[in-house]
Amino acid sequence: MKKILSFILGSVVALTLSMSVANSAAKEVRVAFFLEWPTPNQEDKVKGIYEKALGVPVKWTNFSNGGAMTDAMLAGDIDISYSQGLVPFINAVKSKAPLKLVDIAMEYGMGGTTCVTSNASGITKANGSELEGKKVAVPLGTMAEYVFDESMKVIGADRSKMDVIQMDPEEGAAALVSGDVVMACLFGGNSIKAATAVGSRLLTVQEARDAGILGIDITSVTDKFMKENPGMLRTFIEVTHEANARYAAGKSDMNVIAKDAEMKLGDMKETIGGFKFLTPAETEKSMTSGNLAGFLKGMDTPNGAVDTSFLPL
């Protein structure tokens, strides 16, 4: 009798667990991404490879900055933010946001994120202190703000003496063109191209690299989605790294990526060429003891913000 009861109870528990797993599986996956920020997995996005691997629809929504991605995740509208800037993520977890960093989208120099001064202003690296007292456009709470702060250290200008105006990249580029600001810090190939049509980079890509200014974009996820759908999250990251490997092998469809990024092919190739897409092993090293770990420590990021267990190692 005890054996029968034990079998029945065991069966009930097993059934309950299987139902729980089934019920927790998401009916769709909602992903945030950026336009003008080309990445290999956009080919998979367009060709439905994520849907095939996950078995559910994937809804992609473009955002203007990483802070907006965080807001959407906290509102319950986004599950995964792909290529979110590290700075907005750090700001979020410092405020105890229930988010986790689970992958590195890419590392990059200042080709894709930079500060541009207008030619009309006559301001360059050599006389950068003249930015003080002037209006500058910066998308606050993003990697571009980090680049702004680090660039000001290099040229010896005091941020507190500038009129810093919150503007997303497209707005900042337009303000630079119209003369409303003397400098715009921005990201995204189209916005940078518009800005450099009337201005010049305050620091060249090489000067920024020499100064140790490195950008890192990450993949973040809500704690809720991670706990309820660990298999889906792991699959999403696997597909992403497969796309990166295809790109490294020179087998990506660049025309598809350019079209999805809403960029001209030449501009897209120039932008993506400045990105470094890490292998899973390189990603783990960066997250535990490399560039990412150093960045997190330097910005006093709370412990427990990173989870490497979903990497396809």
Language-model features, listed with the residues they occupy:
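Pocket-lining segment of extracytoplasmic ligand-binding domains
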Residues: 164-165, 170-257
